[in-house]
Regions:
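Cysteine-cluster motifs in flexible loop/terminal segments that predominantly coordinate metals
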Residues: 29-52, 637
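Beta1/beta-strand and adjacent pyrophosphate-binding region of the FAD-binding site
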Residues: 60-76
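Short hydrophobic core segments
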Residues: 69-71, 261, 374-384, 532
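Flavin-dependent oxidoreductases
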Residues: 79, 239-255, 266, 360-448, ...
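Glycine-rich FAD pyrophosphate-binding loop
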Residues: 85-106
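Dinucleotide-binding Rossmann-like beta1-alpha1 core, especially the glycine-rich loop
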Residues: 110-190, 199, 434-435
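Helical element adjacent to the flavin cofactor pocket in flavoenzyme catalytic cores
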Residues: 203-261, 322-338, 352, 359, ...
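C-terminal catalytic lobe of FAD-dependent flavoproteins
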Residues: 432, 441-442, 453, 458-591, ...
Length: 688
């Protein structure tokens, strides 16, 4: 059951889980976590592992012609793709970045809003509450973790109480249920740590929260498991209208470091068979020379030995780009991991954020390796902040996306007890909902976001110090007692705000075979499952034949299992507890990330799923390895290097081909592991 009034919130994965919106203690989790994965014995399952930069091809397509192409693999694209997997259709999902959920989905609050704030009659209002009500059942099927914790809009004076009353009426108009205004006495029983000046609040018990990228990953996995094809690192550069559909030109890019690692020198091209032939020919030459007395008899053995030694040396000094062997010790691979980025690096720009942020082509120093042609009967344009550019490719200029930046600060789990509900100030008529204070599913306290329109220089050009001051000072008005020195991470997302002021969910007026799902800003995550149903309806109206897929399986196994402290787990130096990738009992005990207690088995489980993974960042989003207090500090437990080594062992990729966690990405912190002086600066900015 859910947390009691005034009690500290549960932490997902710690002695239990949130499942379908409610809390389950560990002893009640057996039905959720038992038999969660087909037993895998290493290379016996290797044929099921997805190739690089794509899932396994769709059985319903020839690789070029598809019924539907979905552009964008955030929570909207993933939700739509999963819904389409319920039908006998060939579906291709294209993502410009190096993983699913790398755009706005990665950089937001993860709130499943109730829908009381949305203007009646808009798409926001139409789909938010409907989507909200779909989350409990979705989580029961997909196990991404959903907490129905409720939200509170706080009022500090009578004028603001009037705003609460207006919000209550608006919510009821939108069909939102169970809303009520809570007076001060009951409010402080619910939330004893809020600002003592608060006198009332609007309570929405049906609001909840998820980890947004874990939600999108679950949707995408289940879609691919049911036949949808995914290709990552695919930038759509052109769309041509044809009589029989739409033809897309797609650039497949890869990081330059990966391309260089695949290059083979002439000496590396010499294989073992070729060396044997060379050795045989050299021996014949020497033997012939000896017969003709051109080679002294006593020198023959020495010359033969020299030739053989040379051939062996060539193979040792210039090995081919072979796969990493499964029996390579993890300790040996960790030593090859290289330095972990924690300072310097390239800052992510707004243009980068439109196409995947830290996972985009520019930040990854990518180069086109292939240009693909894809044909589709219908195209779903859910490319986030890039969706207006996709529309322009067919001559549709009916909307424009102007990204709005939202900055956040993430605090340690030891601050998570300060609230159980999601806390908002009274909304500003211009700035909207305002900053929030919330305890995440995993127990961290999250503060933010800002609302910086990129077309306003004074907002877009705010310094890191100004952004931090804005967040901390505003959040202090909600919960005065949090400690900013417990900040462990900072990030920013770009909301795809359209010039129409509402979500755009419609057939293109230029060509009805393209359906726009654009400008999906807040509360888009809450509305995503309902939006997916609407897209299916539009497709059917447009002539897309929908026949139920009799083999559709709605279930997806979780990756992370709940833990009771260190019970049954083992920590140690690299190599002490590492397995060979075959002993699942040993892997389930071996802790790879100390702060988050991520096990080797959880990393392996993520790698053996249907989505392509070739970076520690992708594993981080699926298992939380590197997301804890130390943020992957190599001086602590070196978890990022350990994860990189496991990726190499499981996939066979050389360490040089495995991506890491980029820095600084969108952080307002000066380095990944902030020094005491920077944390003290945060404290002073809170009190300025």
């Amino acid at each position: 059951m859910s947390a009691n009034k005034g009690s500290a919130p549960h932490q997902h994965g710690v002695k239990g889980v949130y499942h379908g919106g409610e809390w389950l203690d560990m002893e009640d989790c057996d039905g959720v976590f038992s038999n969660i994965e087909e037993k895998c014995s290493g290379c016996k399952n290797e044929g099921k592992c997805p190739p690089r930069s794509r899932s396994r091809p769709s059985a319903n397509s020839d690789g070029t012609n598809y019924d539907i192409v979905v552009i964008g693999a955030g929570c909207i694209g993933a939700a739509i793709s999963r819904e389409l997997a319920k039908y006998k259709l060939s579906v291709l999902m294209l993502e410009a970045s190096d993983d699913v959920s790398q755009g706005a989905t990665k950089g937001n609050s993860g709130i499943v809003h109730a829908g009381y704030d949305d203007k009646p009659g808009t798409n926001h209002a139409k789909f938010c509450w409907t989507g909200n009500q779909m989350f409990p059942d979705l989580d029961k099927d997909l196990n991404f973790g959903y907490q129905k914790n409720g939200s509170l809009v706080l009022a500090t004076n009578k004028d603001e109480v009037g705003i609460l009353e207006d919000l209550l009426k608006r919510g009821e108009t939108n069909g939102v249920q169970n809303l009520r205004i809570v007076e001060k006495k009951e409010l402080f029983e619910m939330e004893p740590h809020i600002n003592p000046n608060v006198i009332a609040a609007l309570y929405a018990p049906d609001a909840g929260n998820v980890i947004p990228y874990e939600f999108a990953i679950a949707l995408a996995e289940n879609a691919v498991d049911n036949g949808v094809e995914l290709r990552i690192r695919r930038e759509v550069t052109g769309i041509t209208r044809k009589d029989d559909g739409l033809e897309l030109t797609v650039n497949h890019w890869e990081p330059k470091a990966y391309i260089l690692s695949k290059e083979v020198s002439p000496l590396q091209k010499i294989g073992t068979t070729q060396l044997i032939i060379l050795g045989f020919l050299a021996s014949l030459t020497l033997w012939a020379g000896a017969l003709m007395n051109l080679v002294p008899a006593g020198a023959f053995p020495k010359l033969m030995g020299t030739i053989l030694a040379f051939l062996v040396l060539v193979k040792v000094l210039f090995p081919g780009k072979s796969k990493v062997e499964r029996n390579t010790p993890i300790s040996e691979l960790v030593n090859q991991a290289g330095a972990i980025e924690g300072s310097g690096g390239t800052k992510v720009s707004v243009d980068d954020m439109k196409v995947g942020g830290s996972g985009c082509r520019t930040i990854q120093n990518g180069e086109t390796v292939e240009t693909e042609t894809v044909k589709a009967k219908f195209v779903i344009n859910c490319a986030g902040s890039y969706s207006d550019k996709i529309a322009n490719m067919i001559g549709d200029k009916s909307f424009c996306i102007k990204p709005r930046l939202g900055d956040y600060l993430l605090l340690n789990r030891n601050q998570g007890h300060l609230t159980t509900k999601t806390l908002f100030p009274c909304p500003d008529p211009i700035l909207g909902k305002g900053v929030l204070v919330q305890t995440t599913l995993w127990g961290n306290l999250i503060l933010g976001p800002t609302a910086r329109d990129v077309y306003k220089p004074e907002a877009a050009n705010m310094t890191a110090a100004e952004v931090q001051h804005y967040i901390l000072s505003k959040c202090k008005n909600l919960v005065p007692s949090f400690d900013p020195k417990e900040t462990i991470h900072a990030f920013c997302g770009a909301r795809a705000k359209s010039d129409r002021g509402d979500w755009i969910i419609e057939n293109s007026a230029v060509d009805g075979r393209m359906i726009h799902v654009a400008g999906i800003d807040s509360p888009g995550l809450a509305g995503s499952p309902a939006i997916a149903l609407e897209v299916v309806r539009l497709l059917e109206e447009s002539g897309c034949k929908l026949t139920a897929n009799p083999t559709f399986n709605p279930r997806r196994a979780p990756i992370i299992t709940p833990k009771d402290g260190m019970r049954g787990l083992k920590m140690g130096s690299v190599g002490k507890n590492d397995s060979d990738g075959l002993d699942e009992a040993k892997m389930s005990q071996n802790v790879i990330c100390k702060c988050e207690k991520v096990t080797e088995l959880e990393v392996v489980r993520a790698l053996r799923r249907s989505l392509p993974i070739d970076s520690t960042q992708a594993i981080r989003k699926r298992t939380r390895a590197g997301m804890g207090h130390c943020q992957g500090d190599p001086a602590n437990y070196n978890c990022e290097a350990r994860v990189k080594a496991i990726i190499a062992r499981e996939t066979g990729m050389p360490m040089s081909q495995i991506g890491g966690r980029p820095w600084p990405a969108t952080s307002t912190l000066s380095q990944r592991w902030p020094e005491e002086s920077e944390l003290k600066d945060l404290e002073s900015r809170m009190n300025e």
